């Protein structure tokens, strides 16, 4: 599901809310989440999961085109850990 699909489905299920308002709300939620992670804070949505930053240590990588070794710097990457309710719900669907 893409962001556009999400907006479309939410707008269809919320007849009283125009698609433009749904789109603005989704964009604001995602912006706030990105901003929170950018500040180094953790996001927890009970029953769904949590978003945090994990540190990737510096390492030696490889350029796939040339095969040359490349030094990669350490960096923080977003990480999602699903909550118990989401994990159980997904496993029931199988």
Swiss-Prot record:
SMART domains xrefs: BHL
A Gene Ontology term for the protein's cellular component: cytosol
Keyword Cell cycle listed: no
Functional summary from the UniProt entry: This protein is one of the two subunits of integration host factor, a specific DNA-binding protein that functions in genetic recombination as well as in transcriptional and translational control.
Subunit structure: Heterodimer of an alpha and a beta chain.
Classification lineage: Bacteria, Pseudomonadati, Pseudomonadota, Gammaproteobacteria, Aeromonadales
Entries under HAMAP family matching the protein: IHF_beta
Name of the molecule in the record: Integration host factor subunit beta
Single GO term (MF): structural constituent of chromatin
Similarity comment text for this entry: Belongs to the bacterial histone-like protein family.
Source organism superkingdom: Bacteria
CDD domains: IHF_B
Keywords: DNA recombination, DNA-binding, Transcription, Transcription regulation, Translation regulation
